[in-house]
Amino acid sequence: MDVLFIHQNFPGQFRHLAAHLAADPKHRVVAICQPHAPRHPKVPNTFVYQPARKPRPGTHHYLHGMEDGVLNGQAVARVLLKLKKQGFAPDIVIAHPGWGEALYVKDVFPATRLLSFFEFFYHSDGADANFDPEYPLSFDGRARIRTRNALHLLNLTACDAGISPTHWQKSLHPAEFHSKISVIHEGIDTRAVAPNPRQTFTLPNGKILTFQDEVVTYVARNLEPYRGFHQFMRAAEEICRRRSKTEFVIVGGDDVSYGQRPSDGQTYREKLLQEVRIDPKRLHFLGRIPYERYLALLQVSSAHVYLTVPFVLSWSMLEAMSAGCLVIGSDTTPVREVLEHGKNGLLVDFFSPKHIADAIEEAFSHESRVQLVRRAARQTVIESYQLEIGLSRYQKIIESLVASQVEMTARETAAIDQ
């Protein structure tokens, strides 16, 4: 089977799936991505695309994302046409269409099955936007969100089938497309991400943390309100007042992945450090760190705080559970799909730093009960989010799509012969 992956940041969500398919000699795996993408060592046949230009400044700002998507789609189509000219015709294309790259796949390869990864469908109410009253949504923002979904609607109509990683993320898409979308989480490697009570973690100041220390961890791609960074810092201030030995270890960059940047040019980290009073000797900002070091941090964590507005569920929460962390998660819809309060984690009010701090303190005060919750957290990932489960489900839908195309081609050929 010839498989083509399209993802601007390949491998992205397809890291494990691409490796799994590439390991089978029956498959030829090819990928298309942007030049900055990390790529995958097991997929050497990776081609890059480069949009001809950026969206024009004169384009209406509601349509910048759409124009960007069209430019990306055109650039990918040029690569596809070259591959087609060289004789390559994929049996299936697996794409993250969020940036427009898959818009014209069917125009180049009409018979090829297109499996698209549907991560999010935007709403001005009921999801991320307008959730946090500290960051209200303007009418202009509402209109921009409605327009932004035009690209996603094109993607939904173009694909043969879709994947969403959680039931909640699927539910955000228009009901008329639900029959197209299967829920398959890409999966967590539970063998690699596992508890290790003998692990140590050395801080930049030379202090060595172990599983016996009071260690509160927080991880995000970037430190920003979408992932509750402001509420975490306020809760950390409260814990710092209550307990003298707690260390706070924070992983994440100073950029903004989602939402708006601060209007004054500061980072959210700078703004929160001006607001809260925390002993700087116990507050450790690590920035972005290598994956192995991140896993070691999870393994010494006493309480892992994961806060998010209703948005895409982070891999880091499931990885923390797989590592045996006590996860203190916001009582928001994507988190509730996985965490059951008191059973495999603790749910807290996103808007209450005191409630978050109380849950952190519970992690230090009820060791025997917390151990049961930790074990249940890992078991949840093993039973429902383990890598092998995701790969198996992906394999089934891929085989089904390709088989349906083969069957359709056979019927068409038979009709011609008659």
Language-model regions, residue ranges each:
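Aromatic "clamp/platform" in nucleotide-sugar-dependent glycosyltransferases that forms part
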Residues: 309
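Short hydrophobic beta-strand element within catalytic cores of glycosyltransferases
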Residues: 326-329
